[in-house]
Amino acid sequence: MAVIIRSTGTHIPERRMPNSELATLVDTTEEWIDSHTGIGARHLAADGVLTSDMAVDAAKKALAKAGVEPRELDLIVVATATPDYFGFPATACIVQDKLGAYGSAAFDLGAGCTGFIYALDVASSMLEARKARHALVIGAEALSRIVDWQDRSTCVLFGDGAGAAVISRIEEAGRGLIASVLGAEGSGAMDLFLIQEERNATFERAAPLVPKISMNGKKVYDFAVKTITVLVKR
């Protein structure tokens, strides 16, 4: 028995912001962005387009390639830091409804940049444990809406879009996902976070504030390089 990635699909917003345009907004240059990040451009969702909209578009493409009908899905997992709604309902439930995948399990997963990897691991494990057939794994973000466009250390890095994968449990041996390694380092949580209202209690009433991304770029970079090297060797 194995779990395979049967197909993938993407949603790339039409609006494209090249480095040359970004260099007119903040104190940076096209060459600096390219040399430090390797990014040439980022795509931005149009006004009114939600995370679930991008997720659904990517999902439809993946399902069509796989030849799997939405009603055949047993599970939908959406990894996102920018859900349609804070708290609930889950964006995965909205995606389920828009696809017509009635009856499937559906939930969101939040793990930042590693969200899709976590979602793929969780979904494949659930397919094996529950002896289910098909799952839809989606990573979707509308990060441009929480980026501080005056902060060059973060606005150069993030954009919008979605990717989806249909994964399936098969009886054939010698194929499929081989292994995965997951981990976290909670001590660095505040090196990359959303600036929000300070609250004494989780749901204490407070004045609304649009959250913005804050990042200690050097620490995040050092951690990523060190950790990826260790994980690859494992």
Q: Language-model segments: which ranges?
A:
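Condensing-enzyme catalytic core mediating Claisen C-C bond formation in acyl metabolism
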Residues: M1-D47, D151-K226, V230-K233
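Short beta-strand segments
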Residues: R6, A79, G110, A135-E141, ...
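Acidic, glycine-rich active-site loops and adjacent beta-strand->loop/helix elements
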Residues: T10-H11, A79-D84, A111-F116, G139-S144, ...
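Conserved catalytic cysteine-centered active-site region
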Residues: W32-D53, A81-A135
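Generic recognition of short, well-ordered alpha-helical segments
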Residues: D57, P89-A90, W149
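Phosphate/pyrophosphate-binding loops at sites that engage ATP/ADP/AMP, CoA/4′-phosphopantetheine
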Residues: A58-D74, L231-R234
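Structural signature of cysteine-dependent C-C bond-forming condensing enzymes
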Residues: K65-D74, L99-A105, L127-E141, E172
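Flexible, glycine-rich active-site loops centered on histidine and acidic residues
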Residues: M126-A162
